[in-house]
Amino acid sequence: MPLFKKLLSLMTTLVMIMIMGQPALANARFERFELMWNDATDAERYFMPTEVKAYACGLSTSDFIFFARVVEGEGGDSDENITDKVFVAATVLNRCMCSRWPTRSVIATLQRPGQFEVVDRETHQTHCGRSLDSEWAIVIAYRMVENKEIDCHMVYYNAYGFTGYSRQFINYAYFGGNYFSLLTCQCASCTSRMPDWDEDECEMLPDDYAILRPDGVGPHYI
């Protein structure tokens, strides 16, 4: 066999070995992420690499980064808590699950035109940075939505106030940043998540409601 053909055959074999080995490497990497996450405290998780937090939320690293940048740009900053940022992230997750919304993935929901002020309508990109606070807010939002600690009907917010909102909306929360509202919905998803929900029993969250950073962790926002 000519030398060129031998080299070509060897290169092809090496490429095939690399391709076949990628799933095993990825699985080993994700297993390491899972061990890191499960064996850590929240204070340790807060400072973990972005890719580990993304894995914990079931997102690709690129989607998680985009999500964190939107949360950073849309959510209010506070030295005391990350409540506003968590509720922005939870609003996105609630929209993904509500059957009334046309998008099912986080990235599609974030890039839907006209939904988020910090996302460009034409390019679907954002120029905001991200912080440890905004990354952690996403982690906590996933946790709270899964545990039904935040009303699944919370799918709207703005920074201007409750005045002028549609009559379909129910005032839900204000923490000094955004005004969050509930939307009456009887879709299959919302009904299954909160079967006993009654709009007449909905009340504003108290002013002292707060979602704190892990013990010993100070503010990290841009």
What is each residue range found by the language model?
Residues 30-222:
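Bacterial extracytoplasmic/cell-wall-associated proteins, especially those involved in peptidoglycan
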Residues 1-33, 220-221:
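Gram-positive cell-envelope targeting signals
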